[in-house]
Amino acid sequence: MPHHAALSYPWTARYAKFLALVLLYGATVHIGNMAGLTGTPWLSTPLLWRGMDVALLSFEMVAAIALWRGLGWSVWLVFCGIIGLQFLPYTMWRSQFILQPEDAQTLNGLLGTEAFLLGMFALLLLIKK
């Protein structure tokens, strides 16, 4: 079954809209980072962090709009984007994102939350409800 059809099921469509809101929240966090509202001036953060802020802001805005509109390709975008832009960098280059001891716990929480959100979405897509 095409993914756009799966997004037409009531619970899957509702969850897609919920994920869109979660992604918009993430986008506002990246805007806050860039504006220096989250504690550290953006230009004093590592270049990798700044690049990730830009990449994730772009991804989260496009994915949120596409999910909200129920576009079939948004399913692939969300899974590939979260895996490629969060799981891989935050595990492969983990030390680059941990400047203070509490950063490790924050990363673990973020990855756990993302895994849960993707797992629920996958479950809804598979059971097609």
Residue ranges with predicted function:
Residues 1-129:
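Topology signature of small-to-medium multi-pass alpha-helical membrane proteins
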